[in-house]
Amino acid sequence: MPASFVSAPARRVEIARTILSQLPEWFGIPAATEEYITDAAHEPCFVCEKDGAPVGFLCLKETGRSTVELAVMGVLKPCHRKGYGRALVDAAVAYARQTGYEFMQVKTVQMGKYEEYDRTNRFYLSCGFKEFEVFPTLWDEWNPCQIYVLSLNR
């Protein structure tokens, strides 16, 4: 189940809307979700499909000359733990290396706050990301922001 690059901006938006609308446990703030969706039009994005339909996607955003952020990622719940997320991260890492980035970062809610996000944290750790820093009030006090980083140097 390889992930593929999505070149058409309208298709990126369509995929983001389709996936995120089905993941309210992670994307339950409408304004924030809409921002992820509209930003997808301007970001490098990857998709995994099953039977011709998108089941997961990931978008990247440059945050510095050497760093790219995994800006948003979603995989439909029935497809969790089936390799789709790993395929998306692998494709994003390959793209980031090819593009010349040295680091990838991702933000999520700190481990220990919500079970859904604990699974997300464990996934990023399993992909090789390392804990970098926690910003307790970046989003709000109920959602402390954990930043993970991944070195893209081999």
Locate predicted features.
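Short amphipathic alpha-helix that is part of the acyltransferase structural core
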Residues: 1-31
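Short hydrophobic/aromatic beta-strand or adjacent loop that forms the aromatic wall/cage
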Residues: 43, 143-148
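Conserved beta-strand in the GNAT
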Residues: 47, 53-61, 67-74
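Conserved acetyl-CoA pyrophosphate-binding loop and the N-cap/start of the following alpha-helix
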Residues: 79, 83-91
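Conserved GNAT acetyl-CoA-binding A-motif
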Residues: 96-116
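Short glycine/proline-centered loop/turn elements that form peptide/ligand docking sites
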Residues: 115-120, 134-144
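Conserved active-site tyrosine of GNAT-family acetyltransferases
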Residues: 124, 129
